[in-house]
């Protein structure tokens, strides 16, 4: 099976602001462009799962107009990491001690009192386990953190020990990568 990991278009938020579970809209033109580019690439009848955050819903709706053959389903497990009290704050306004603690305990530190990276890994692994053994091509419209977690799952890694193991790259906004499973 092929798993398409698609990142939403560029969000309408000032650079340097922490947003994960914060429900920020994406640029409408960039979303439409991403949908047009993606529509011609996806196989017929693919299953499409998408995050309920509006930046992904926007892309799902634009893509569904172009590709009504896609079987679309919202899946809350595909949301970005919840940074709790950090959400909506400037990264440089978050206490240095908290950021250092996250780096030191990367897998288990609850950012802003909410999720930790291992929570995200576990949540994404549940979706992975449910769909990745099936033959139907599957598309996830999601976020960079979920895509990074998926990259680790594709390598057979369900837990990480420290920040050095977390993938540094993800597709650019409105772009995608495909994993063969």
Task: Provide a role label for each language-model segment.
Residues 64-123:
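Phosphate-handling substructures
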Residues 2-67:
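Active-site-proximal alpha-helix that buttresses catalytic centers in soluble enzyme cores
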Residues 3-4, 46, 134-145:
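Generic beta-sheet signal
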Residues 35-39, 121, 125-132:
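Generic structural signal for well-ordered alpha-helical scaffold segments
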Residues 50-51, 122, 141-142:
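Short beta-strand scaffold positions
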Residues 12, 55-57, 80-81, 146-149:
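Short, active-site-adjacent cap segments at secondary-structure transitions
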Residues 155-181:
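Domain-level recognition of soluble alpha/beta enzyme cores
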């Amino acid at each position: 099976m092929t798993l398409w990991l698609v990142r939403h278009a560029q969000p309408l938020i000032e650079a340097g602001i922490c947003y994960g579970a914060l429900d920020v809209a994406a640029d409408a033109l960039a979303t439409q462009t991403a949908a047009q580019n993606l529509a011609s690439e996806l196989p017929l009848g693919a299953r499409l799962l998408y995050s309920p955050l509006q930046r992904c819903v926007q892309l799902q709706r634009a893509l569904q107009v172009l590709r009504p053959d896609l079987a679309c389903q919202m899946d809350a497990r595909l949301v970005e990491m919840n940074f709790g009290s950090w959400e909506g704050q400037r990264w440089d306004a978050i206490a240095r001690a908290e950021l250092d603690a996250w780096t030191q305990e990367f897998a288990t530190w609850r950012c802003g009192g909410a999720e930790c990276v291992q929570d995200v890994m576990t949540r994404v692994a549940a979706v992975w386990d449910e769909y990745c053994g099936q033959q139907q091509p599957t598309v996830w419209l999601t976020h960079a953190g979920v895509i990074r977690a998926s990259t680790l799952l594709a390598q057979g890694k369900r837990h990480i020990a420290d920040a050095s193991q977390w993938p540094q790259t993800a597709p650019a906004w409105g772009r995608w990568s495909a994993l063969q499973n």
